[in-house]
Curated annotation (Swiss-Prot):
Gene name linked to the record: murG
Catalytic reactions of this protein: di-trans,octa-cis-undecaprenyl diphospho-N-acetyl-alpha-D-muramoyl-L-alanyl-D-glutamyl-meso-2,6-diaminopimeloyl-D-alanyl-D-alanine + UDP-N-acetyl-alpha-D-glucosamine = di-trans,octa-cis-undecaprenyl diphospho-[N-acetyl-alpha-D-glucosaminyl-(1->4)]-N-acetyl-alpha-D-muramoyl-L-alanyl-D-glutamyl-meso-2,6-diaminopimeloyl-D-alanyl-D-alanine + UDP + H(+)
Disulfide-bond pairs as recorded: none
Record protein name field: UDP-N-acetylglucosamine--N-acetylmuramyl-(pentapeptide) pyrophosphoryl-undecaprenol N-acetylglucosamine transferase
Protein family membership: Belongs to the glycosyltransferase 28 family. MurG subfamily.
Organism in which the protein naturally occurs: Chlamydia abortus (strain DSM 27085 / S26/3) (Chlamydophila abortus)
Amino acid sequence: MMKKINKIALAVGGSGGHIVPALATREAFCREGVDVLLLGKGLENHPSLGEQQILYKEIPSGLPTFVRPITAVRRVCSLYAGYKKAKKELLIFDPDVVIGFGSYHSLPVLMAALKKKIPIFLHEQNVVPGKVNKLFSRFAKGVGVSFPPVIKRFACPAQEIALPKRAFSSFNPIVERLTSHSPTICVVGGSLGAKTLNDHVPPALVEVAKDYPHMYVHHVAGPKGDVVSIQHVYSRGGVSFCVKSFEQDMLSVLLSSDLVISRAGATIMDELLWAQSPSILIPYPGAYRHQEENAKFFVYTIGGGSMILEKQLSKAVLTKNILLALDPETIKNRREALRAYYQNKSSKSFYQFICECL
């Protein structure tokens, strides 16, 4: 018999690749009647929140890496302050379980949970484990993963789970516009890695439009993207487009796209699989190159698209890859490969996995 869970605290912060899965998990747990508290840093203004009303407490954090001594001292002090505040919030909320979603922002909360002997679970979104998740797996009850290759990298039981998806609209005027064009291309660079795609992709798509004059581009430029400049490139090239900083209804856009040009962060990877969207992946080169490993899995194991390393990016390389990706037979084969993989993915929820492990 599975144990009933009444309260869960989620330790989260950092990029959208950590925050979006945590918010989707929160929604899934709330549907199970669980009270959920988010503990972390930088969530209050994150665009993924939309109009959601969440129970959230800001927790200071710091990454004690090899930097200048004064910076290291400040970070350690911030980490300790976060640890103390996390202990206080956990004492007040009294959760049955704490779940860490990776990034150093989860560190003080996981430390506090360990000190208070609250069961810890982790969620790993990538093909390669993050440092905090790998460290705390030796203390955790279990790890829910998005991709099977990472299971063997942890010191506790790990299992593939079905990552909850962002809510999406069954009717969206954006989708109506997308489906009236052919082909439709979505460009999305993520919350932190969009600049390179914003600089390189629009000129290549202007070139591609010479072969596809009815092409439509939906470009998500990210919170720091220069929307006006990108619009100018498409407009000057005669390309039909929509450019925006953030797309609240990303799944609807992916479902309606013939090709997605994207980074290879964990959240977009999982959503590309769900939407069965053939893709060109341009992995962000930082953060121990985990996006490159994500992209390799998507391209070589699943067969869902192609990969271009950032150091290989040029207008000519992008144009060639986009034209190849828009070939109808290529789209058909890649979509079938994605469908075959997704049909065999685990359907077990994180909630079920946690209840079974307790």
